[in-house]
Regions:
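Short, aromatic- and cysteine-enriched interfacial helices/patches
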Residues: 212-213, 268
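Single-residue recognition of alpha-helix capping/boundary positions
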Residues: 180, 234, 263-266
Length: 279
């Protein structure tokens, strides 16, 4: 039940082979807990293991949904099996600084701030994910690359401060909210549609349902050196681009597209590049 073992700081291990459900905050604050066996659990509540700073691994292979704040501040957690999970709740892994990689093969939705400040996270596999919540990966400073082949929506500030993020693959995306990639100073490759190569950038043929929020790529210069799908028609149809969406972005396209519907920050061009402009 709720708060069943809350703040039992002397508890070091748990073996519950027949339990199928764990209530909210059941083991929250059990700072001495290092080992836990819950092989039959299918449902886990909110903040269930919050603050279990000694926990290093856990098998939740039968769980389908991870509640809000389940692993907040589990700073020693390095290994977790969530092979059947389809939903990751808000703040689920907030500040799990030791977590370096996680495989979520069935997950379709990542909640708000789900992996915020997971500073050790270098890779994540989300082959079925459709939605990425606001600030889901904010300040994941070690995250280098991520493939999101089915994602259609990316929330506000989803990847803010991911300074090592070098490439991202988003072939199905239709809506990228404000500040989604703000502070991604290492970003070199973005694929939004079609097939791309390193240092490539592809834009879908936009309509009024396609949105790019303000300041998505504005913090640092992003060089798009392999542009193969940038046409006048594609650009002029993209009417939902936010303010400064294309600030600091350069490309080697030789046409003269019009961006009359966009607001672009004034910049100085490097040699051999053309600045995306508003005229």
């Amino acid at each position: 039940g709720y708060n069943a073992f809350n703040k039992c700081t002397g508890l070091t291990s748990i073996d519950l082979p027949k339990v199928t459900e764990i209530g909210n905050r059941a083991f929250a604050g059990c700072t001495g807990l290092t080992s836990i066996n819950l092989p039959q659990v299918t449902k886990i509540g909110y903040n269930t293991l919050q603050g279990c700073t000694g926990l290093t691994s856990i098998d939740l292979s039968q769980v389908t949904k991870i509640g809000n704040g389940t692993f907040v501040n589990c700073t020693s957690l390095t290994n977790i099996d969530l092979s059947q999970a389809t939903d990751i709740g808000e703040n689920a892994f907030w500040n799990c600084t030791a977590l370096t990689s996680i495989d979520l093969p069935q997950v379709t939705d990542i909640g708000v701030s789900a992996f915020w400040s997971c500073t050790g996270l270098t890779s994540i596999d989300l082959p079925q994910a459709i939605g990425i919540g606001e600030r889901a990966f904010q300040d994941c400073t070690a995250l280098a690359s991520i493939d999101l082949p089915k994602v259609t929506n990316i929330g506000i500030g989803a990847f803010v401060g991911c300074g090592k993020l070098a490439s991202i693959y988003l072939p199905q995306v239709t809506d990228i909210r404000e500040d989604a990639f703000f502070g991604c100073t290492g970003l070199k490759s973005i694929v939004l549609s079609g097939t791309g190569t390193e240092n490539s950038f592809a834009l879908p043929t936009c309509d009024t349902t396609y949105g790019l929020g303000s300041q998505n790529f504005s913090p640092e210069n992003l060089f798009l050196t392999g542009v193969t799908e940038l046409t006048d028609e594609q650009i002029t149809q993209c009417r939902n681009w936010g303010n400064k969406t294309w600030a600091n972005i350069y490309y080697n396209y030789k046409g003269s597209p019009s961006l009359a519907e966009a607001t672009i920050e004034e910049l100085t061009n490097p040699d051999n590049y053309t600045k995306v402009t508003d005229k």
